[in-house]
Regions:
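Catalytic beta-strand-to-alpha-helix segment of the class III nucleotidyl cyclase homology domain
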Residues: 93-171
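Regulatory cytosolic signal-relay segments
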Residues: 1-38, 65
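Residue-level detector of functional hotspots within protein domains
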Residues: 27-29, 34-37, 70, 78, ...
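Generic alpha-helical secondary structure signal
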Residues: 7-8, 55, 138
Length: 171
């Protein structure tokens, strides 16, 4: 039975791959560039500082619980127009059309001094929006900015610093 199941599965997968290669995958074709939407957004990445050490100290299951609480605290504190678009491990990607509002959120989130500490990086620009997610150079830059943040820090690009809300200053 195992042999036939493996052979059937392989044939089924190969058949689907051939259909997709021939362009017959249920009528869905890859999106043309002009079907993608460019939108001006602020993109933030927030992750837990010292997550590797945390998993070693607490174990995987408790570390996952910590990540779930972290992401829930992000989602519950976001301005109404912002949202968590995805999580990757201990990192959350947050997007908002309101750049000053996302800056205010990042600063206030870090002021909470949660443990373990977060690192947040922000950038803004024209990103590609496709099927509920954001892509492109601006998103990649936001991710790299977050990687430069230390525990408890918010690091922004020059573009974001120029658009910061009144009352917020950056060193």
């Amino acid at each position: 039975h195992q042999y036939y199941l493996r052979v059937f599965t392989e044939q089924d997968v190969i058949g689907h791959m051939e259909e997709l290669a021939a362009g017959a995958g249920g009528g869905e074709q890859p999106k043309e560039r002009d079907e993608l939407t460019r939108v001006r957004v602020a993109v933030a990445f927030a992750d837990l500082a010292g997550y590797t050490r945390l998993t070693e100290e607490l174990g995987d299951a408790r570390a996952v619980d910590t990540v779930e609480r972290f992401v829930a605290s992000i989602a519950s504190s976001l301005p109404s127009e912002a949202r968590v678009t995805k999580t990757i491990g201990d990192e959350a990607m947050i997007v908002s059309p309101d750049i000053p509002a996302l800056v205010r959120w990042a600063v206030s989130f870090q002021a909470q001094e949660i443990e373990p500490s977060a690192r947040i990086g922000l950038h803004c620009g024209q990103a590609l929006f496709y099927e509920g997610d954001y892509y492109g150079r601006e998103v990649n830059l936001a991710s790299r900015v977050a990687a430069r943040a230390a525990a408890g820090e918010v690091v922004v690009t020059g573009t974001v610093a120029e658009l910061k809300p009144p009352g917020v200053s950056f060193d």
